[in-house]
Amino acid sequence: MGTEGVRTDRLSILLEQFDKATDMARARLSGLGDEEYLWEPVPGCWSIRRRDEAVTPQAFGPGEWVLDQGDPDIPAGEYAEVARQAASGMSVEKIAEDWSVSVARVEEVLAHTGEPEPDDTPLTTIAWRLSHLHYEFAGGWEWAFGERRQDPKQMVDFTPSAAVALERFWETVDRWRTAVGGVTEEQLDTIGFSQYPYGSDPDDPFVGVIAGANLEFVHHMAEIALLRDLWRVRHAWSGR
């Protein structure tokens, strides 16, 4: 494979990774309809719902449709991340603030030994996963390049229309991509360049925030792709 003309600086590598991921995601989401977008493969899924039909205690959103969310907790799959935060010198109090849980809950996680119990977090719909990504990228832009004042969870008007959701989502993603493309080397290394209020962004160099955004995008798009595959064959396996 030739490498002539290929840039290998940190930002270019991250942007190339993101661009390839978004190209694949755009193709993978082609033809998404409303029924598939809102499809609940099993009972008890988290999704987007009308505000007066919300089934979770912390559902949020600025409009008629809200995104399901349960009470704050640290899922078993994130125990290793909490241990990493503690090992890096982050205080228990700060970890608790990042996860919106009590200090006692963080101490319980850090004291855990052996394999964590399986997570009981409900399965989520394509609508939930796409909406989750949408508000994170909207908030990511706001708290790094915008006015740093809007609550990310109130920035996206969730919709039951797949076409409308995708149009708005890609506009948000494109705005993030354009802004990140102009970041300087100094800004990449600036701790707190992003003040995103949920998570550890204010304590991280911005290069780590960008890498984390890439990972979050790939992670959720892979889940959406699998749900699309299951939707396509749903009649075959539902009768077994």
Located regions from the model:
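Short alpha-helical "recognition helix" segments of helix-turn-helix
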Residues: 94-98
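Short, charge-rich amphipathic alpha-helical segments embedded
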Residues: 104-112
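Generic beta-strand or strand-like secondary-structure segments
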Residues: 105, 128, 132, 168-171, ...
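Acidic/histidine-rich alpha-helical segments that form the ligand environment
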Residues: 157-193, 205-218
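Short, amphipathic alpha-helical "recognition" segments used to contact nucleic acids or chromatin
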Residues: 74-90, 105
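Short, contiguous alpha-helical
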Residues: 1-81, 111-155, 194-240
